[in-house]
Amino acid sequence: MESQQLSNYPHISHGSACASVTSKEVHTNQDPLDVSASKIQEYDKASTKANSQQTTTPASSAVPENPHHASPQPASVPPPQNGPYPQQCMMTQNQANPSGWSFYGHPSMIPYTPYQMSPMYFPPGPQSQFPQYPSSVGTPLSTPSPESGNTFTDSSSADSDMTSTKKYVRPPPMLTSPNDFPNWVKTYIKFLQNSNLGGIIPTVNGKPVRQITDDELTFLYNTFQIFAPSQFLPTWVKDILSVDYTDIMKILSKSIEKMQSDTQEANDIVTLANLQYNGSTPADAFETKVTNIIDRLNNNGIHINNKVACQLIMRGLSGEYKFLRYTRHRHLNMTVAELFLDIHAIYEEQQGSRNSKPNYRRNPSDEKNDSRSYTNTTKPKVIARNPQKTNNSKSKTARAHNVSTSNNSPSTDNDSISKSTTEPIQLNNKHDLHLGQKLTESTVNHTNHSDDELPGHLLLDSGASRTLIRSAHHIHSASSNPDINVVDAQKRNIPINAIGDLQFHFQDNTKTSIKVLHTPNIAYDLLSLNELAAVDITACFTKNVLERSDGTVLAPIVKYGDFYWVSKKYLLPSNISVPTINNVHTSESTRKYPYPFIHRMLAHANAQTIRYSLKNNTITYFNESDVDWSSAIDYQCPDCLIGKSTKHRHIKGSRLKYQNSYEPFQYLHTDIFGPVHNLPKSAPSYFISFTDETTKFRWVYPLHDRREDSILDVFTTILAFIKNQFQASVLVIQMDRGSEYTNRTLHKFLEKNGITPCYTTTADSRAHGVAERLNRTLLDDCRTQLQCSGLPNHLWFSAIEFSTIVRNSLASPKSKKSARQHAGLAGLDISTLLPFGQPVIVNDHNPNSKIHPRGIPGYALHPSRNSYGYIIYLPSLKKTVDTTNYVILQGKESRLDQFNYDALTFDEDLNRLTASYHSFIASNEIQESNDLNIESDHDFQSDIELHPEQPRNVLSKAVSPTDSTPPSTHTEDSKRVSKTNIRAPREVDPNISESNILPSKKRSSTPQISNIESTGSGGMHKLNVPLLAPMSQSNTHESSYASKSKDFRHSDSYSDNETNHTNVPISSTGGTNNKTVPQTSEQETEKRIIHRSPSIDTSSSESNSLHHVVPIKTSDTCPKENTEESIIADLPLPDLPPEPPTELSDSFKELPPINSRQTNSSLGGIGDSNAYTTINSKKRSLEDNETEIKVSRDTWNTKNMRSLEPPRSKKRIHLIAAVKAVKSIKPIRTTLRYDEAITYNKDIKEKEKYIEAYHKEVNQLLKMNTWDTDKYYDRKEIDPKRVINSMFIFNRKRDGTHKARFVARGDIQHPDTYDSGMQSNTVHHYALMTSLSLALDNNYYITQLDISSAYLYADIKEELYIRPPPHLGMNDKLIRLKKSLYGLKQSGANWYETIKSYLIKQCGMEEVRGWSCVFKNSQVTICLFVDDMILFSKDLNSNKRIIAKLKMQYDTKIINLGESDDEIQYDILGLEIKYQRGKYMKLGMENSLTEKIPKLNVPLNPNGRKLGAPGQPGLYINQQELELEEDDYKMKVHEMQKLIGLASYVGYKFRFDLLYYINTLAQHILFPSKQVLDMTYELIQFIWNTRDKQLIWHKSKPVKPTNKLVVISDASYGNQPYYKSQIGNIYLLNGKVIGGKSTKASLTCTSTTEAEIHAISESVPLLNNLSYLIQELDKKPITKGLLTDSKSTISIIISNNEEKFRNRFFGTKAMRLRDEVSGNHLHVCYIETKKNIADVMTKPLPIKTFKLLTNKWIH
């Protein structure tokens, strides 16, 4: 039946429908559809009518009532018409049944138009079931309705489905674009409502009013499918339909959510633009409303800056808030928070005024007189109605920022004022004076402030309790008044210079006076109506006059803007001068303490808190008047700005109030902070704080971890303390829900002690605000203290404890008492307190000798808990002590470099402050206390072990007996010490970047030794001893010797041996006489040397010179013949020349003394382990650098050195942005695109060559059948994720040929189109070097092959499509790939599997296990690198047979057959190889470097002398503050990537001598400072100068047919940042260097021996793998050797005594190493340090040493 109907109407197509029943489309700017169905109003007010006259035909319906919606009502059917819109056809309910789906197979094939299935339709009567329909259904969104004259009728609310049915319903328009979907879905929802389906539309909460029926779901699906074609749906809609194609309800719900969000944004913008506030509601509520709106808009991407927000807020202010519009118009940098401060101040003033309800006087003679007067009040508070702020945020003082100038100020003068003056003088604008309005006032010439808002007038202020004036000319009987406190509306202090009388002479010749305060720090002269009322003068604002109570008019009032003014002409001038007034305040004879000093003394607390504390005697010893508060208002502490920087203020009222009913110490708040990273193990990483709810008393305890037992110990301690000290019991402890508080152990403890745990709600920071705010405050103080003092970060908890002590003693502004007072304790005696980090000298009661200094420099931390002493940090001892034997070091405070503190000196203040305390100590001290060794009560910092940062100041170097560098002083008397700038050390933040160093031109360290004959005046003599710069500080077994070189600057000998010193000159700083030290024997010299840090390992002395190889023989490692000697015999070790005796150079005296940093160095330097061994340490002279390259350096000026120290490391401020930015840096592009090479190439010849290469590539692609040429696919038919973009790339090869390559964009390939588990293998570089070395020793032929278009031989399994090449001109078509095109993720793996299978099955090869791409059979070895093959064999015919088989399958080219007996040159994987069979092989990259380096734009210096080494020891990379523009930063990082990338490529290929420098600089790629770039340039310069160097191999001639594989290992202990060690290994095969490695140890070693063990253990796995490869390729016996210069390591390896190192940190690794040596039959041998060529891998060396260790194997 249905098919018959369709055949009768063939023009009706599936999926199309039409209707003449339409509703008028309303076009409006407003949203035509509200957000939810529950709130939707009818979009159309009534149903539309037909264009022609309508007639209705009643119809009977037997359709049963639908329980989910209203019963269908009879509808009027329009009669036939001649218009373009045919008559609507109705259908029966049976026809609406979706049973037709089974016939057509899918809902999309249903023959019914969707709106015909709406439940509102029913059979109208007998008529044709399928009348003529239009060709389309609906109209596009952009098409207006074709109907006219539509009428509307009211419809009921959409909240209920029991509504009357509309007679005619217009279908929704067709969706024509994904961008129109939001508008379309609104009309679609309206269509559903009109179809009586409003109840199924999701509401705001995403749920419909009622459940949808199956028929309604069918109707919903079909209408959506027809009117919203799938190609025009947004992506998020397609994603929903891809899961369930019938889930239209979810689409509607999501759409409503999006519309709700858009509506919220629009509502917020409208609300913000129409703000109104007059003080009728609380200011807090108004602020919360505005800030919430701004935050929502910002979160939704609509940024509202402070300027716009302030303008919108001020525009809506009215009433008493209106004046903020005018007083803020010059404040360009005002923030919303600052504006609300003013609003809060005015609101609080209003509330105070309402509570006090001031009385207004009435004039008895005139009831209409509205004279207002306030009774005078004695409170010294001035609420300025015109608060002003400065243009910047330096000061919050209400200063005089005037708003008008003298050019437009009124100048008319009229002294006569009649009583009949009733009209107010209105001046709405200062220019109104020129519009005929006369101002009946005159100005006083000498008091005219021309930039006032109304010059020559006083501002009448009803809110001010005192009169303030800026000019001193009107003040009578002036006197100082330091005790008066005046604040403005924002509670900011206003400094007062003087107090006096202000005398008036009014027009009725009456005179009167009031009190006046003089201050220049106000915006306007304020006349208090309260004080006028006190002298019977009131202001009548109805008549605008000042008058007495009897009605006598005294002066007129001028209204200008929103304020009222009175002329200054009625003031009587005084004869006092301005300087007299200004100097009144400073005439006191007693000098006061400066506020900056007190601010720092009291832990950087704010001025208001300090004043409260002094006023309430919570701080004793001096009073509030003893402090100079004049600078407190505008003082800006830079350390506070840095340390206490916050995002915004804490929200008021966030604290809960329910704890107020508890007694002191019954309710505690607690919280844990941490961890703090990159600290020594002895320093705490956490702290736990406690705060009492009632007294606000605070406790802090350090923690090393957050384990249950650690937390339990702290709880036990504080509960016992409160119980014993305060006789109180804790009832409740409030804490968060961290696991450290919710564990069962603590819960049982609290339950046992009867304590209720009160846990806060998860993520509710407000409920836990007390503890969290305390932690934040303490951390702010901590950062500020560390910033101000410069102490290292591991003392962070000392700063926390200092802050806790002080803050427990400061009064709270609310309670007016301190926590100590609430707890019943006495106030803090400030005379016992020292500023945090104050330099002091601590008495050493037990020095090492009688001639050593008695004082040790230190830094005061905080008062001791356990004694009357002070906790002092001693950097030289790396510990803190509790002592009273200290002296405050006087001198200027030297703080941060960026702030100038030199103008501040508090020595005299500090002496005055502590005088009484020290006199008390002196008078009561019976005997000298020897408490230096009393450890601090803080065990966590009693011994600071392995601390990477040390204080760097000359004083500590001069007097510390344990410092690594003997003192270097230049003092003439003791006064020189007091003037030295002493500052605690700065450390490099480990979160910024690794602090590393690289070789460069720097002065060598010149250590000094104090003379025995030091003078008693405090001066010290220095012993000038010529010492060479250290070559290594890592190994304690490396001996240290004094120099014996005759010429210190140009000595060619390797001067490291022991020697006797004769006639060592001594220069005294106190005179010019030179003294000599008698000839000292070697033994006597050693007696003076004190080794402070002996090695952790064995007792075998390694400080003696070892001139010969000392083999360690064991039964396991040595056969009968001397295996060690045979292993070392043919290695390329240096030949040490004889060393002539050393004479001292006179130039040595001129070298300036420099103190070595006490941190570790990756390039040498003096560390703690070298303490007092400087005479026999390895040094080198300053002139021992042969380089003359002119590269700028970030060196410090010797004349301007502060404490003779290197510049402090500075933190990078843009690290996070820098790391993000570098991710976006693209690698350098060396190829050309199609348009660059062909389309727009102006070089005709080059263009022709590229065209030729292009056609050659296309022909090769077609030849290889790369894609399916039989069929082209339409782009719309293919899944987009299977379409791979492709492109042609062009480049010019090194041999001059032009090459084109058609590649796929694998970088944007979808992950579903390849198997991520497949690997693309290539030959390892060690395998290639091993094969080349064996080829030289076995006279192998080497043949080089290339397979053209190798990837195209591999089939592709996945279904992938690409765009055709450009010349085909089919941009809208796709072709399917059949081969692995270059660039695809899987192409490399596919080719590897293809060629591997062919070599194994067809060529009879097998792959060496563990070494991918290395194939071998009994005759040939093949190394495969993508499409390059290198063949090795004794018989050239064997290679030819393999080549013949390869040519059968692949297009194989013979690059070099290698058949000549003469020298043959190869270019194998970037290496330029010269090979003569049976003689030698040379590996280099001269041609490649000659071509590439000049293209790097490096400032090369070809004319200067060549560099002798890639760097030199002794230079630190300073982490300076890196402030670069983003583009400049990206450019420099890009440059570093290119330079280090090239250096790495060269280094890992064959220049193993450069690996240390490359590895170090690679760590600073993201920190391209000028110093780092200069060092990189120097490295590239060295590579350029030595580009002709080659790795030299000679054929070995062993006595027996064996292969010898040796690894030489070395380690530099603790020379990397944070005491990491640098390890290095060099691998040799038959005496030929085949590889090297230099890297930073992954773990921190605790001794030299552990570092050496770590280096050896890192080399063993590769050694074993290479051994297996060699045995597979060459069937000869193999001997494996392991060489090290650490005898202690060897003794551990060969020893059978496990107790020797069982309890040491490296015991496990040592045991494993012993097993590996034994199990792999490794021969462990000792090599002399001076012959250890692996030394170049671990540290920078002097030029001569570097050449000596490398000239045997690379030259």
From Swiss-Prot:
Residues 1-10, 48-60, 127-152, 1005-1015, 1031-1043, 1054-1082, 1095-1106 have a biased composition (Polar residues). GO terms for molecular function: aspartic-type endopeptidase activity; ATP binding; DNA binding; DNA-directed DNA polymerase activity; RNA binding; RNA-directed DNA polymerase activity; RNA-DNA hybrid ribonuclease activity; zinc ion binding. One of its GO terms (biological process) is DNA integration. Residues 1610-1752 form the RNase H Ty1/copia-type domain. PROSITE patterns: ASP_PROTEASE, INTEGRASE. Initially, virus-like particles (VLPs) are composed of the structural unprocessed proteins Gag and Gag-Pol, and also contain the host initiator methionine tRNA (tRNA(i)-Met) which serves as a primer for minus-strand DNA synthesis, and a dimer of genomic Ty RNA. Processing of the polyproteins occurs within the particle and proceeds by an ordered pathway, called maturation. First, the protease (PR) is released by autocatalytic cleavage of the Gag-Pol polyprotein yielding capsid protein p45 and a Pol-p154 precursor protein. Residues 1-93, 126-173, 352-421, 956-1172 are annotated as: Disordered. One of its GO terms (cellular component) is cytoplasm. Pfam families: rve, RVT_2, TYA. Its EC number is 3.4.23.-, 2.7.7.49, 2.7.7.7, 3.1.26.4. Residues 660-835 form the Integrase catalytic domain. Mg(2+) 3 binds at residues 1610, 1652, 1685. It is found in: Cytoplasm; Nucleus. Mg(2+) 2 binds at residues 1346, 1427-1428. Residues 1338-1476 form the Reverse transcriptase Ty1/copia-type domain. The C-terminal RNA-binding region of CA is sufficient for all its nucleocapsid-like chaperone activities. Retrotransposons are mobile genetic entities that are able to replicate via an RNA intermediate and a reverse transcription step. In contrast to retroviruses, retrotransposons are non-infectious, lack an envelope and remain intracellular. Ty1 retrotransposons belong to the copia elements (pseudoviridae). This is Transposon Ty1-GR3 Gag-Pol polyprotein.
